[in-house]
């Protein structure tokens, strides 16, 4: 089996690329970073530090790389069995034209073996969004062929991969946590379902997407925002602060109550999942900076994201949300000189006041009870 993976960054190398290569799949990375491309093509291998209770070093081998903006990537799409991405939500639109060209070439070459494309991004149904961009870039006469022969498979991914400065200045070395979860929608594949260790197939993807968003992402963000306010440097430092831990755990329990109601999750199993996530935040090997995790607060405070979406669920089912409100208030306080969204957030609050600013960012009604609760909590933190 041959695969092409867009994005040779830390997540690409440390998570999806590693799983594919470990499964014995012939893997090519596509990226724009020439330093990384040259290193991959010179060595065809790299090291991954897997850290949890203990630390181990795995070597990923037998890989190569092409530029994601050259002709080679188009040729590969015409030949491979699987295309995956870990490029970030914004970049999906940028890689769509190359994918479309590759699919046209595949059709012209008469290659009718099924191709499956899986976007492994921190977003809900990212592959469906990528499909929209690809279809827009395709000529009309290729669209029906692509619908017939190409599967666009949505997925949910979970592994903490912080940016790590390699002690050896190796551009390929990467550190990841032991835990990883890659869940894909088995109803969207073309051809035979793949058997890749570490890839879990489900016919109920949204339950897993929301479980991760409402627990890992909600908890991670609130830990970062409260941690930054309290002067902590890392996620570990923040979650070991008992006051912060109580709010984070409380928020994950509030969002969890929504999941249990919505998807009939087992309450005990979900409580264990929350405990496991708190343990991941404590990982001493992951130097996960609160400022990195907190960045892009406007996106994280938007209606479909990790803070407001679970809050809307609590309103839908009439459930408590005190700790989620604390997290939202802390997010409104997030300041970072390196993050344009943090600066935009500060300017918006200064210009409109916290009530109107939160309503504009989140889509919540400015006169609603929850906005007033969040504003009260926000002011109490000043």
UniProtKB/Swiss-Prot annotation:
Residues reported to bind NAD(+): 3-14
Gene3D superfamilies documented for this protein: N-(1-d-carboxylethyl)-l-norvaline Dehydrogenase, domain 2, NAD(P)-binding Rossmann-like Domain
Keywords: Acetylation, NAD, Oxidoreductase
GO cellular component: cytosol
UniProt key word Oxidoreductase: yes
GO BP annotations, alphabetical order: mannitol catabolic process
Superkingdom of the organism of origin: Bacteria
Cross-referenced InterPro entries: 6-PGluconate_DH-like_C_sf (IPR008927), 6PGD_dom2 (IPR013328), Mannitol_1_phos_5_DH (IPR023028), Mannitol_DH (IPR000669), Mannitol_DH_C (IPR013118), Mannitol_DH_CS (IPR023027), Mannitol_DH_N (IPR013131), NAD(P)-bd_dom_sf (IPR036291)
SUPFAM superfamilies recorded: 6-phosphogluconate dehydrogenase C-terminal domain-like (SSF48179), NAD(P)-binding Rossmann-fold domains (SSF51735)
Keyword Ion transport: no
EC number(s) reported in the record: 1.1.1.17
GO molecular function: mannitol-1-phosphate 5-dehydrogenase activity
UniProt catalytic activity: D-mannitol 1-phosphate + NAD(+) = beta-D-fructose 6-phosphate + NADH + H(+)
Chain positions found as N6-acetyllysine: 269
Family: Belongs to the mannitol dehydrogenase family.
Name of the molecule in the record: Mannitol-1-phosphate 5-dehydrogenase
Organism from which the protein derives: Escherichia coli O45:K1 (strain S88 / ExPEC)
């Amino acid at each position: 089996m041959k695969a092409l993976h867009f994005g040779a960054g830390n997540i690409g190398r440390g998570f999806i690329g590693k799983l594919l290569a470990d499964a014995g799949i012939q893997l090519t990375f596509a990226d724009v970073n020439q330093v990384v491309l040259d290193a991959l093509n010179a060595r065809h291998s790299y090291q991954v530090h897997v850290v949890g209770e203990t630390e181990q070093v795995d070597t990923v081998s037998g890989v190569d790389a092409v530029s994601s903006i050259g002709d080679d990537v188009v040729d590969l799409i015409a030949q491979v069995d699987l295309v995956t991405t870990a490029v970030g939500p914004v970049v999906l639109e940028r890689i769509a034209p190359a994918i479309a060209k590759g699919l046209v070439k595949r059709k012209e070459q008469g290659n009718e073996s099924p191709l499956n494309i899986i976007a492994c991004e921190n977003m809900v149904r990212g592959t469906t969004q990528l499909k929209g961009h690809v279809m827009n870039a395709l000529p009309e006469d290729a669209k029906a062929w692509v619908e017939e022969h190409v599967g666009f498979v949505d997925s949910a991914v979970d592994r903490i991969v912080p940016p790590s400065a390699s002690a050896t200045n190796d551009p390929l070395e990467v550190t990841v946590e032991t835990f990883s979860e890659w869940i894909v929608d088995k109803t969207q594949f073309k051809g035979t379902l793949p058997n890749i260790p570490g890839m879990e197939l489900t016919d109920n993807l949204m339950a897993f997407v929301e479980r991760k968003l409402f627990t890992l992402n909600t908890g991670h963000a609130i830990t970062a925002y409260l941690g930054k306010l309290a002067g902590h440097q890392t996620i570990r430092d923040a979650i070991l602060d008992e006051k912060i831990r109580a709010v984070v755990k409380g928020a994950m329990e509030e969002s969890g109550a929504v999941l249990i109601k919505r998807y009939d999750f087992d309450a005990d199993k979900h409580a264990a999942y929350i405990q496991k996530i708190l343990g991941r935040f404590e990982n001493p090997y992951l130097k996960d900076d609160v400022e990195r995790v907190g960045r892009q607060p406007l996106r994280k405070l938007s209606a479909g994201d990790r803070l407001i979406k679970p809050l809307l669920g609590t309103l839908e089912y009439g459930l408590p949300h005190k700790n989620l409100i604390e997290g939202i208030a802390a997010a409104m306080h997030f300041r970072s000189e390196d993050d344009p969204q943090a600066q935009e957030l500060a300017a918006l609050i200064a210009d409109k006041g916290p009530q109107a600013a939160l309503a504009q960012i989140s889509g919540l009604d400015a006169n609603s009870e929850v906005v007033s609760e969040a504003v009260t909590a926000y002011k109490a933190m000043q």
